[in-house]
Amino acid sequence: GIPLYILNAGDNEVVRIDLLIEGGRWQQSQRLQALFTNRMLREGTRRYSAAAIAEKLDYYGAWLELSSSSEYAYITLYSLNKYLPETLDIFESIVKEPLFPEKELGVIIDSNIQQFLVNSSKVDFLAHRTLINAVYGDTHPCGQLVQKEDYHLINPSVLQSFYDRYYHSGNCSIYLAGKVSEDAIRRIETLFGSEPFGKDFRKPEKLSYVPVTSSEKRIFTERADAMQSAVRMGMLSLDRRHPDYLKVRVLVTLFGGYFGSRLMSNIREDKGYTYGISAGIMPYPDSGLLVVNAETANEFVEPLIKEVYHEIDRLQNDLVPAEELAMVKNYMLGDMCRSYESAFSLADAWIFIHTSGLPDSYVRDAVEAVKTITPVEIRELASRYLCKETLKEIVSGKKMS
């Protein structure tokens, strides 16, 4: 059977149903296949046209979200309890019998190509693409960059084959959150638990890829008409299951993860090189990517990069003052509290823990890591994990002589 997880919380007569399919970019046989398979589910099924789906959901005050990640596809329905029989009927049809109609697919691909071309003229988009390709390489799903031609290679049969392989009852789980009634549980069990659906009942094989990092330290992508340059600095970092990860998160927040961070205080407030600079760890299935992000006037690119290294030096050599560390801790603990306030944000946390293969104690461990970390540990972690030599420098903008 399909695992069904229930989180009954909240006072409003609303529920959210998340159906997760194990099949994302990691599993696709060509670029964009996972994304468009998921995106096209609402564009017509055996029982409903795209217009009927949109109209009915609207009429019942329901909301459908489709998204896909490295290893999962998400189909999410928000519905009022009183209309759940009607909205679940549409939801079931979307999951079990999509048609991937050619006309609707053509329209969506055209609008995605337009968006891609608009993005391709933006320096931050170019810098980000260049960075992940430099860090992961062409053979890794993260480093494989979508090109305009890839959109033209998507057709209904490409999507149908991905759907047939991954969208089935042997490869999904359901999360039900909000004010959950016995009736809601019974309906979901009837629709999804009584008989298997889909064609292929194999679980996907767990795939792992080895990053092939470029040897270049600095990579420049030119946009001759750019008023500003985008700067991305990045390197491979810890994955979420690493024992040091939760404490490194505190270090990275202090470095560039909130408004009072070192990078903001120095490079924005003090030097005025940029309106905003940040650092964070982007999580992927088997690694993290530490990224420093900024946009700046072309003439400030070099001084900005120099100051980033200066802030790394300070973290590696000096102890963080107690009051500054207390401020970061308060910020992070407050942020965590806000993340677990509502039934739906709790469901998000819970899905995140399951899909990342983390222990159930993860939230408790995260709070503990923030509360207990010391200035000495911050300095040690900075020396171990903020490695200036491996940090790539990507600049996208106008060439300065």
Predicted regions and their residues:
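His/Glu-rich zincin catalytic helix
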Residues: 1-55, 160-266, 305-309, 390-401
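Charge-rich, well-structured scaffold segments of protease-associated domains
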Residues: 52-203, 239, 269-401
